[in-house]
């Protein structure tokens, strides 16, 4: 995205002070692309000339969490830290870190602290757990604004995103009133005075990471984004789960949608060439345009990776018990209602309707359309 040097004055607030109760760890410190979610968002934010950039955080933000190109000089004043960067011919850029005056009040506490200390006509309010927000949609949000509105709220698939939205500075008084009444709903401050903009075509920008599952799915998306070709592995801890049949159904559906699918099969048998009704033959007949059979060997995982990345396709599906690449879908045996999986497993594929997990998404083996939709999400298709 190019810098927007002549856009209307606008300040940025990054909300990094939440309890992260569902994530069970501080979302602002989650590893993301060789840094953290907070550092990544700060780095991306400098494509836009914000009047003020403020981080709301109820912890100490270490200097190393601030990108090097921002961290040039700092001033500390009580619960506020300011970083000032002079861009040579550019204007100065200010980054401030503030803590809430009103504790345990959710996002409104951070909004009150920022708006009180740094008055601004407009604010872009962002939760820190939006790893794909690259600020390219800021001009569209500004274009939808009008004097009578207090907020511009993006809507994705019918769902409002008030923590990735544009607010007028005048909502500060509404925030104070809401806090005084112990009403901490963000919607309270823009209800009936907002314009809603459909951002469904840009849904990835608003994908947030509220849970361990969402974080793992986001990691899968960015991992595949950086690969020569996206990969999804379908695995099973035992035989007899029906994973090969499942894969052929997935290949058939993806092929019908116009995608070129590759298939890599990990096996402990020696390869003897093409064979009727073999797994690779079934994959080919289902629509796979490339297949590879990888036998056991000292560098099997590398061989699987090389085979997958050499295929000129839209997506590669890997079938394996132990050597698949991240992200993995684990197919459960018919009687199983749960599984431990591993750090690379993002979802369980089950025949039971009572399978639930806080660590993995769950998909039903007979719902091929939902399974294909999920695979496309992980593969950025």
Predicted regions and their residues:
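Nucleotide and nucleotide-moiety/phosphate-recognizing core
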Residues: 5-161, 166-170, 176-183, 192-205, ...
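Short, charged/polar "capping" segments at the starts of alpha-helices
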Residues: 60-69, 271-274, 336-340, 353-358
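A charged, well-structured terminal subsegment
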Residues: 177-213, 368-381
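Glycine-rich phosphate-binding P-loop
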Residues: 232-255
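N-terminal phosphate/diphosphate-binding loop that engages ATP/GTP or pyrophosphate donors
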Residues: 249-299
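Glycine-rich phosphate-binding loop used to anchor ATP phosphates in small-molecule kinases
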Residues: 296-334
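Phosphate/Mg2+-binding loops and adjacent switch elements
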Residues: 318-381
